[in-house]
């Protein structure tokens, strides 16, 4: 076996190891993110309007070639922006109040970004 083939073999093996590491980290962190979102999401309103919101967080894994695309979403997607950022309460076209923001996505998003990077760095050492 010549030097070029040996180097290519070593690089291929390394690349496959990195790909597996990244996929494993993405899967583990996304599962933990779902747990955190379910724990920190608003549970119910006074009128029971979104009582299942906290339980509706899901992970979709969509592989694209060797890279995974992890999507974390809520089935009640219409509520995510309203709950995260707050919104006006309108009755019959008149603003009657304001619902305060309940930030629960942004803290988990920040954690996911730092945790993925940290775990990949640790795995490569």
What role is predicted for each listed range?
Residues 1-73, 77-80, 85-125:
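Short, Lys/Arg-rich flexible segments
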